[in-house]
Amino acid sequence: MQIITEPCQMQAVVEKLRLNRQLIGVVMTMGALHEGHLSLIKQARSLAGTVILTIFVNPKQFGPDEDFHRYPRPFELDASHAKAAGVDYLFAPSPEAIYPEGFQTTVQTGAVAEGLEGMKRPGHFNGVATVVTKLLLITKPHIALFGEKDAQQLAVINRLVRDLNLDVRIIGAPIVREENGLAVSSRNIYLSKEQRESATVLFRGILHAEKELAAGRTDLAGIAGEIERMIAGEPECRPDYVCFVHDNDFMTAETAEPAGEYRLLIAAYAGTVRLIDNRRFTT
């Protein structure tokens, strides 16, 4: 595995790979690799001849009161995991390499990014869209894999690729969960034993929605309210939002229609750690 830190060097490498007709897959991360990331690498390995992993803690997607400086950066361990997983190139640029002095251009997102995470974290998705665009232009992949845990982010990236005619196929990969149902996340390391146990309420909320929809309920807002109360009833947790949206545009859905496609989105705090989860439902 080769570690590359300069964008120009990465671009030169992928140019040669493309000339040699190598199918390139990329997995973008902020490091602190976990089983979810490793599953993305494994899937990329099965689909592409060359796998690039990017590690970049993007300052432009963190708000002023968020955990940018606290975000875990175990680079040596990440590199070891990446090599063992079969990564060919690890691209780990510095913030100065991605955003050099005088950097001015940003990608502005649209309606799909306005609600939920976009409302709670102003500017977050513009930061995501900007860095994803840059990393796609630098790594020039044929396929790029992203986890479905960040469902709204995936929707933003899909819209970005369509709107800008970027020549890459975006693949969403299923959420990887711990044995207790908690969605795997780099931030889970901050959870105490008690908080980790309470945080399973997010998955229990999803199972509640699954049960109610299977029984024929259509009042999505009512189900969301029940899940919000479940979270509020946990001693270590408090809800941020619980909402059903139309899966194609992330607009709020109050009532389920026949043959509708919806996504339940949950954000909550366990202590000071913000967690998200989701599931897609077809009625």
From Swiss-Prot:
Its main location: cytoplasm. One of its GO terms (biological process) is pantothenate biosynthetic process. Its EC number is 6.3.2.1. One of its GO terms (cellular component) is cytosol. It comes from the Bacteria. Beta-alanine binds at Q61. The reaction proceeds by a bi uni uni bi ping pong mechanism. This is Pantothenate synthetase. It comes from Chlorobium limicola (strain DSM 245 / NBRC 103803 / 6330). The gene is panC.
